[in-house]
Each structure stands twice: as C-alpha cells, then as structure tokens.
C-alpha cells in the first residue's frame, strides 16, 4: 500500500468522476449539503500552511460553544456532545484548586479535540505572587508544547514574561465592563475578551464594534454576585482569595438586612446569592450584539451537568446557524444526542438572564442557595416511615425529592417509590406513590396535606447520562479510482483536507461486476467505528475487479488514519497577537487595590502603559481599614423596592442614599450605594489574624481550600471572645 496526504489548499479537486450509471444510482443529497457546509467552514483552514505563522483567533463569522471541564474525561464528553472548545485547569494557577490536570493529560485531550478542530483553552487565571512567576512561565511553555490553543489569563504580569507565542484570552477576572478597558486589552495583545456578566446588549455591541478581539460571554451557570475580580470578602473573612481560586462563597450564606434606622428589611435570607445564568432566550440577540464565543460556567460541575448543558446549547446554536448562512460552526462534525437535554434536570438555583436585557427585581435566589428542582406533585399524607404523594410525572427508586419548610429545603432520597395507582385530574394523568425515604427527615412530620413536592434528581434520566449519550461524526467524501493495476482511495473531509492511499494490483476481473462495485460502495459507507460519516461516494471504475474484502477494509482503515493525521496537522492553531504600535495608554493614571496588581511584572506592565501610581492587591495585606470588599451590580435597595429610581416620577437621583447593613452572626457589613452606575458596595475590614498570615503564594504556610460550603464557612469565621 502507498499513502499520500494532500493539504487543504493543494489544488487537487476530486480525482475522478464516478462511472456513468453507477453514480446516478448512488447519488444522494448529502454531497450537496457537504458542499454548502464546506464553503462556510473551509475559509480559515485554507490559509493555514506549515511555514506561515498564524495569529488567527476565532473568525468573525464563527460561533463557538465553549464548555467547562473539571478533568479531561469531562472535556472529551463535552466535545462529543457538541462543544467547539473546552476550557480546563492545568496543574496549578487555574483558579479552581480542586480541578487540576497534569500537562500530559491535557496533551492527550488536545490531540482528541483537534480531530474535530475543537480548541482547548487552559486557565492561568489567578493573580500571581512574585515567587510564582517563574513556575507560571515554565508551565506556560509546557502547555504550549502540549498543543494548547490558548491561555485564559487574569494577571497582566504574564504579558511581561518570556513566554511562547501562544494565543491569550483576557479572563472575566480582568473585569471587562467598560469599552475603555476592552479596547486597552484588545490593543495590548489579547485575542479574545471574556466580558463581564453584568453587561447589557447595548454595552456588548459597543465593545464588539470597537475591538478586533473575539467577544466571549457567559451564557449559562452559576453567577458571582460581584463583578469578577472585584470580590475580596472571602480573603477578608477567611484568608482565602477568590482571585486565586479559593473563594469561600460568603455570598451563599444567610444574612439579615437592616436599614439606616436599624429596622429589619429581610431576616435570614440568602441576600447575596444569585439565581443561575440562563441566556437561552437571548442567544440570537447576543449573536447580533457581536458575541462569538458562548461560554458555559462550571469547572466544578460533574459529567452529567456538562453533557446536558452542552447538548442543550449545541441544539440552540445549531438552530441559529440553520437560519444564518452568513455564520458557521467553529468546529467540525455533526452531533447526535441520545437524550433530550433539559437544564431543569441538573443543578441550578433558578434562572435569570441577569442584566442582558434589563435590570430585573428577581435575580436573587434569596430563599435557598441549593437546587430544589422542578415541581413534581404534592404530599398527601406523612406516615411514620413513609409518605403518600401524588405526582404529575412517574417517580423511580433513587429519585431525589424535597419540600420547602419555613424557608428551609428539606430533601430526601426515595429509597422506594411504590406505585399505588393512577387517575385523571383536570384531564391530566396523575400518579400516586408510597415513598419510603432512605432516612426520614424530621421536617416532613410538620407537613400538611397537599404540600408542594419537588424533584431535584431524576434517577432514570441521570442513569441515561451515565451511558453513551451522544455521537459526533465528521463528514467526508470518498473518491475511489479502480484500475486493473491499482486502487486509489481519496478521502476529503468536510473542511477540505484530503488524504489518499493506494493498493497495488494487478487485480482479476470480477465475476459479478455489479455486486463487486456495490460491495466497494457499501464498504466505504460503513464507518461506524470511526469518527466519520460518508456524505458522498464516487467510484471511477470502467471495469469491476475482484479485491478481497479484507484488503479493502485494511485500505479503508489506512485512508481514515491518514485523513485524521492530516486533519490534526491542519488544525488552525492561533498565536500571540501583537501589541499595537505605539503601545496603548491605560486610561487611568492611578490604580487602586481593586486592580489586583500582586507582582512586579504586573506593575511593570501598567507602568509601561502609562500608569503612574499603583496600589498593591488586597492579598498584599496593605489595606487594613474598611474598604469595599465586594462591588456588585446587584442592589438590595432595588430588590426590596427601596431604590429612589423606582419612585414614581423620579428622573434622576440627587438625594444621598443612606447606607444599610448586612448581618450574619457577629459579622456586620455596611452597604453603600453608588446610584449613578447602579452599583452596591459591600464595605468590610480584613480580620486581624489574617494579616498575620503569609501572603498567598509567597511560599509561607497557608491552608488552601479549593471550595467550601456555606456551612463549613461558618466554622472558619472567628467569633470575638466573650
């Protein structure tokens, strides 16, 4: 056998036309669809040559679905379920301490992703201590050598390091909420900008119009109540820095809200806990506003969550692409899902589109920061060890159920869900079950008849996600040239990459010509164990010859392997974007601690761009008094109809708005309101014992916790001696 690989821009068209008559019998519409898809997708690949250094980021006409991955196994499933790119943490500096991955594992992920021309981004998005700069630089070189497509960066000191020409993306932690900030980062060398979640469509559009960088925006997942990079409450209270991936989630705790007169406005509510982001209704508007990378949050989420949410948005983006011939998918292949994606089936705290369309009063999940799921029925009767329930959907053993009792979620697992009959109510089927929990919660005994029941874990649905739940295949077309002395197979992928292999003869004339050609055609269409599907098959065979089936299969396998190798080599990897000349000047001359400058390289970067005075990051322990430990677009005055702008007839705010207080146990935080930009500042002070700890990353002994529950956080907050 002889193998030959042809590049996408080699100039080779289809090698031969199909034999007259045979082609007519086997013609399909798939070839036409292949051509239409190819025309939209192929452009960025045609400019990619081995000796031309590319700095290409996401093309302006491509839509990218970007999924999170805690580990490489989840990343692979995200790609199979339709992700055009995945973002994943490396062994360190990834802002998720419990979601680390070795470089060798990421290298294997890169090879897998590039088979679909999906991109792999690695997060280096913590702020770095001076002692960490060299380890970070070395890690970046390793990731570049592993083939990673881009780094997601928070610390701008990285821009001053000796790093390879890898594509850089500005993390949402860089706080990109103004046009001026976006333009600066664009001109400073970032290829992709992750905008603040708080922006509306008009603000997004303004940034997209004025920058060359690709615009990335969060479309689903948990919401940080603070502007990203503007939250220091975790470090102030526990010594764990959110800017370094150690957020203690103080925002999920219950608080009491008091006004300036000491009157209670809200008691023991989760007042800083946001609902989850869900932009599914706004996808078309976001496309029109210039968003090109659609990001799902969730690097701590499990496999089922990532599969479900990725599949859900894949289907919705595909719907947009079907109506927009000017746009194309950012990676290759077609995904088929073996389940019906449903965001309500996996963890969320309720849904909000936050500020994308308008400011809304109901963006908070004040009652509970946990997942209560969907209403499923009512509780009829509670016994000593079980309960009788009526549901609108069937239940299964293992389902997770819950009720809300005095603002507290009481959850339990249905160890046994025994059917007790079916009936109709208001024309709809109802199911009665005897449910025996694995452990009977005390709160259930306080329920009255017809108490609402919710299901937050559908056991059967979750089991379906544990199996193979999606398939992704790349389209290819075959051209087979059959002569007595040689059979040549050429496979061309949907991006236009080709590979040719040959089997030398001579071959004997087939006794049954028609059957022999049918056999060859069918064999080329049988790609079940590969990542491909055949869109078109052309045979050029003036005469049919006999070739053993085993040799045909071996040649087909060789062609597929050659095509895959050629496609991976043709993957259009981006590069470091050049800084503008002259370098951009930062629009501010003085940077406060809120700019998170934690090392000398970051100071050098800002000095080089015109900044004169730079305060150290909060983690440097130089801010010992009361300062904003959180800045947020979420306003509790607005949530409780206490905002002056909500008053009838008010067109502007001239009166000074009085502060309020947030109280949790012995912790008292002051709320100040900046009404012009509609922001709330949470004022607090770093605890004295934290000032005695080593600076994070300095090499001193400092306990690191990657994620902490609100309950565990309560145990870490020191109480004053009595």
Go through each PLM region and give its residues.
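Extreme N-terminal basic, low-complexity initiation segments
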Residues: 2-10
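Short, low-complexity intrinsically disordered segments enriched in A/P/G/S/L with frequent Arg
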Residues: 11-17, 21-26, 30, 35-43, ...
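Short, polar loop motifs at secondary-structure junctions
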Residues: 154-158
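Surface-exposed amphipathic alpha-helical tracts and adjacent flexible/coil segments at the periphery
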Residues: 53-81, 85-88, 92-95, 109-110, ...
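Aromatic- and glycine-enriched glycan-recognition loops and surfaces
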Residues: 98-107
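Short active-site loop/helix that positions an aromatic residue
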Residues: 159-164
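Charged/polar low-complexity intrinsically disordered segments
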Residues: 4, 17-20, 54
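Short hydrophobic transmembrane-like helices used for membrane targeting/insertion
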Residues: 1-2, 47
């Amino acid at each position: 056998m002889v193998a030959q690989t042809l590049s996408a821009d080699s100039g080779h068209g289809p090698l031969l036309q199909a034999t007259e008559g045979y082609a007519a019998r086997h013609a399909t519409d798939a070839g036409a669809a292949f051509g239409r898809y190819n025309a939209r997708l192929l452009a960025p690949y045609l400019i990619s040559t081995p000796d031309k250094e590319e700095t290409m980021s996401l093309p302006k006409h491509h839509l990218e679905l970007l999924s999170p991955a805690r580990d490489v196994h989840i990343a692979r499933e995200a790609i199979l379920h339709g992700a055009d790119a995945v973002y994943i943490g490396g062994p360190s500096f990834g802002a998720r301490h419990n979601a680390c991955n070795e470089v060798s594992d990421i290298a294997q992920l890169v090879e897998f992703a590039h088979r679909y021309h999906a991109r792999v981004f690695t997060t280096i998005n913590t702020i770095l201590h001076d002692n960490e700069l060299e380890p970070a630089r070395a890690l970046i070189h390793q990731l570049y050598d592993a083939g990673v497509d881009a780094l997601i960066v928070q610390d701008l000191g990285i821009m001053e390091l000796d790093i390879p020409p890898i594509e850089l993306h500005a993390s949402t932690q860089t706080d990109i909420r103004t046009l001026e900030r976006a333009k600066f980062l664009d001109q400073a060398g970032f290829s992709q900008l992750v905008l603040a979640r708080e922006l509306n469509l008009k603000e997004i559009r303004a940034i997209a119009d004025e920058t060359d960088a690709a615009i990335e925006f969060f479309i689903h997942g948990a919401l940080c109540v603070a502007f990203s990079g503007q939250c220091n409450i975790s470090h102030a209270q526990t010594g764990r820095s959110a800017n370094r991936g150690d957020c203690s989630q103080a925002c999920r705790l219950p608080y009491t809200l008091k006004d300036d007169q000491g009157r209670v406005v809200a008691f023991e509510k989760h007042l800083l806990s946001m609902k989850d982001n869900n932009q599914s209704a706004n996808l078309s508007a976001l496309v029109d506003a210039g968003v090109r990378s659609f990001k799902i949050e969730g690097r701590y989420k499990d496999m089922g969550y990532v599969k479900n949410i990725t599949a859900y948005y894949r289907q919705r983006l595909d719907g947009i692409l079907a109506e927009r011939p000017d746009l194309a998918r950012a990676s290759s292949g077609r995904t088929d899902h073996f389940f019906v994606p449903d965001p309500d089936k996996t963890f969320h705290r309720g849904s909000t589109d936050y500020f994308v369309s308008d400011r809304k009063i109901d963006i908070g999940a004040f009652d509970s920061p946990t997942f209560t799921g969907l209403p499923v029925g009512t509780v009829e009767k509670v016994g000593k060890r079980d309960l009788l329930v009526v549901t609108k959907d069937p239940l299964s053993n293992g389902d997770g159920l819950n009720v809300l009792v005095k603002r507290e979620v009481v959850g339990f697992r249905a160890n046994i869900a025994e059917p007790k009959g079916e009936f109709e109510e208001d024309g709809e089927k109802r199911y009665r079950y005897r449910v025996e929990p694995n452990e009977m919660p005390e709160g259930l005994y306080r329920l009255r008849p017809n108490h609402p029941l919710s299901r937050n874990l559908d056991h059967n649905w979750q089991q379906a996600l544990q199996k193979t739940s999606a398939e992704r295949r790349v389209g290819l077309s075959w051209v087979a040239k059959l002569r007595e002395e040689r059979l040549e197979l050429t496979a061309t992928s949907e991006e236009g990459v080709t590979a040719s292999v040959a089997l030398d003869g001579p071959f004997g004339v087939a006794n049954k010509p028609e059957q022999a050609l049918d056999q060859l055609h069918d064999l080329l269409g049988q790609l079940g164990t590969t990542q491909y599907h055949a869109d078109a098959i052309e045979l050029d065979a003036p005469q049919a010859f006999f070739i053993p089936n085993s040799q045909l299969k071996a040649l087909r396998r060789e062609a597929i392997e050659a095509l895959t190798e050629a496609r991976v080599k043709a993957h259009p990897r981006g590069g470091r974007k050049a800084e503008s000349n002259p370098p951009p000047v930062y629009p501010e001359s003085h940077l406060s601690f809120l700019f998170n400058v934690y090392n000398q390289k970051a100071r050098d970067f800002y000095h080089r761009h015109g900044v004169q005075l730079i305060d150290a990051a909060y983690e440097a322990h130089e801010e010992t008094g009361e300062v904003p430990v959180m800045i947020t677009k979420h306003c509790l005055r607005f949530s409780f109809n206490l905002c002056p702008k909500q008053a009838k007839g008010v067109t502007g705010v001239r009166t000074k708005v009085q502060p309020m207080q947030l109280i949790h146990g012995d912790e008292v935080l002051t709320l100040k309101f900046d009404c012009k930009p509609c922001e709330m500042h949470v004022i607090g002070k770093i605890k004295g014992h934290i000032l005695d700890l080593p600076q994070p990353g300095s090499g001193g002994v400092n306990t690191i916790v990657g994620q902490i529950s609100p309950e565990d956080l309560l145990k870490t907050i020191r109480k004053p001696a009595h």
